[in-house]
């Protein structure tokens, strides 16, 4: 009898414990659902309706781009996307969520015209956000990915409560805002992915314990810390995959990004490659037959002053090149770094690069936030276009260098390797490298070519970049984003 009685006692105990837990769980779920419904209704009530001349409700199309006044390739995508949508959907209202409070609407639009030669045909409204600092990497010395992602949710909530759109497009890579606008805002949501927040390559770097800009040496040298970081990355990748899968339309900028986004988001039916717009036509106007064979040779780099661009590698490679040259030859070579600074952190990085060039004893010219015409002038005079970012998602600056007639030397990875610096009709279009020595050797080789050999490579490169024009981007962007407007 003791056995059955003991079993009955166990069952009564489990029942006594299970029922309160079940009731509590159901209660919490009901509270969550009720809270969600109330929040969604509250957000929907904030939605403003404007009626067009035809009596129909105007659609509000909003782009989430907290750094819209920066001068990088991502901003060129934003302005070209806006221009293309305004041409097709003339009656829509266009909004940009931005944190650029230090600039007026007019200054931002004038900046886009000066840097990218882009002018919009219709007005655009700016929603200025107060909490952009929450997505600054400097706020999160540890757990940077998680911190910035959670910060983007808070920033996204501020954006949503200030303006509830019909169509929401994240054009800067803040995927954690997508479920916010879809489920609370009731919006059709789309995104243009320049670079996955986390990738299989990042997991591989941590797993192999290699030190990089996003994997500190004290972690890579410690097996326990590397294991913990790997777990953190895997969990983050799961959440990143879920928030990304909330998007109704997914556009990516290269074969490399496409592959990684499919691995993480698993939405092949909604994902398409839309190469970013490059102002190739303006650069194709440069005559490459007359001015490229001066005795002096400049090496020009285009790219925002961010850590992943690896400008120190450019400076060290150029220093290694100069070591191979005589004093007379060194005097005829110069390195020019052209890029945009988004914040104080980027400006500090420029100061550190200047210090590095001084320590190595080499002259480097820094051109920060320069207008478009000055950028064009430097490219028209350059012999080599230099790019050093590992696993660059695409590389608009690379395409611009090729269109301008420079001989491109890019990193042997990512978009440059898979999409851009590839043979055109079986003819060479540029060079690839991946270390200080290989970059220095490649630059030395380019300078040793005859003028005729260099001209042949330039011409092949120019012929290959037509697929990256503004016109191609606009056609593909409109085709991919069309489901959002149905």
Curated annotation (Swiss-Prot):
Which chain residues lie in intramembrane regions? 230-250, 394-414
Q: Which Pfam families match?
A: ALG11_N, Glycos_transf_1
Q: Which residues cross the membrane?
A: 17-37
Task: Give the UniProt subcellular location, in the record's own words.
Answer: Endoplasmic reticulum membrane
Print the keywords alphabetically: Endoplasmic reticulum, Glycosyltransferase, Membrane, Transferase, Transmembrane, Transmembrane helix
One GO BP on record is: protein N-linked glycosylation
Its cellular-component GO annotations read: endoplasmic reticulum membrane
User: What one GO molecular function would you report for this record?
Assistant: GDP-Man:Man3GlcNAc2-PP-Dol alpha-1,2-mannosyltransferase activity
Provide the family line.
Belongs to the glycosyltransferase group 1 family. Glycosyltransferase 4 subfamily.
Briefly state the protein's biological role: GDP-Man:Man(3)GlcNAc(2)-PP-Dol alpha-1,2-mannosyltransferase that operates in the biosynthetic pathway of dolichol-linked oligosaccharides, the glycan precursors employed in protein asparagine (N)-glycosylation. The assembly of dolichol-linked oligosaccharides begins on the cytosolic side of the endoplasmic reticulum membrane and finishes in its lumen. The sequential addition of sugars to dolichol pyrophosphate produces dolichol-linked oligosaccharides containing fourteen sugars, including two GlcNAcs, nine mannoses and three glucoses.
Task: Give the protein's recorded name.
Answer: GDP-Man:Man(3)GlcNAc(2)-PP-Dol alpha-1,2-mannosyltransferase
């Amino acid at each position: 009898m003791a056995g059955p009685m003991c079993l009955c006692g166990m069952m009564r105990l489990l029942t006594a414990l299970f029922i309160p837990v079940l009731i509590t769980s159901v209660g919490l779920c009901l509270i969550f659902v009720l809270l969600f419904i109330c929040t969604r209704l509250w957000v929907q009530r904030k939605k403003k309706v404007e009626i067009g001349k035809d009596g129909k409700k105007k659609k509000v199309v909003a782009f989430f781009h907290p750094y819209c006044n920066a001068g990088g390739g991502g901003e060129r995508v934003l302005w070209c996307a806006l221009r293309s949508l305004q041409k097709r959907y003339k009656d829509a209202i266009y909004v940009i969520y931005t944190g650029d409070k230090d600039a007026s609407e007019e200054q931002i639009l004038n900046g886009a015209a000066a840097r990218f030669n882009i002018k919009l045909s219709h007005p655009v409204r700016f929603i200025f956000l107060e909490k952009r600092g929450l997505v600054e990497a400097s706020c999160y010395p540890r757990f940077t990915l998680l911190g910035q992602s959670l910060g983007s949710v808070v920033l996204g909530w501020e954006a949503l409560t200030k303006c509830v759109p019909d169509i929401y497009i994240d054009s800067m890579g803040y995927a954690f805002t997508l479920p916010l606008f879809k489920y609370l805002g009731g919006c059709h949501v789309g995104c243009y992915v320049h670079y996955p927040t986390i990738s299989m390559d990042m997991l591989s770097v941590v797993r192999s314990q290699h030190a990089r800009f996003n994997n500190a040496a004290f972690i890579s040298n410690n097996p326990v810390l590397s294991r913990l970081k790997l777990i953190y990355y895997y969990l983050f990748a799961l959440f990143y995959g879920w928030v990304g899968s909330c998007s109704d339309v997914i556009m990516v900028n290269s074969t490399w990004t496409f592959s990684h986004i499919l691995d993480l988001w698993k939405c092949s039916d909604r994902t398409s490659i839309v190469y970013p717009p490059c102002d190739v036509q303006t650069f194709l106007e440069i005559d490459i037959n007359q001015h490229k064979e001066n005795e002096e040779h400049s090496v020009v780099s285009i790219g925002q002053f961010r850590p992943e661009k690896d400008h120190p590698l450019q400076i060290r490679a150029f220093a290694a090149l100069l070591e191979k040259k005589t004093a007379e030859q060194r005097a005829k070579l110069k390195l020019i770094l052209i890029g945009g600074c988004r914040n104080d952190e980027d400006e500090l990085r420029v100061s550190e690069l200047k210090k590095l060039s001084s320590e190595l004893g080499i002259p480097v010219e820094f051109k920060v936030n320069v207008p478009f015409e000055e950028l064009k002038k430097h490219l028209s005079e350059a012999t080599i276009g230099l790019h050093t970012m590992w696993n660059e998602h695409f590389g608009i600056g690379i395409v611009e260098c090729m269109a301008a007639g420079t001989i491109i030397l890019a990193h042997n990875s990512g978009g440059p390797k898979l999409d851009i610096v590839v043979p055109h009709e079986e003819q060479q279009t540029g060079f690839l490298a991946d270390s200080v020595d290989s970059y220095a050797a490649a630059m030395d080789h380019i300078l040793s070519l005859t003028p005729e050999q260099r001209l042949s490579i330039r011409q092949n490169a120019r012929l290959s970049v037509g697929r990256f024009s503004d016109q191609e981007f606009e056609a593909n962007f409109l085709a991919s984003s069309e489901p959002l407007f149905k």
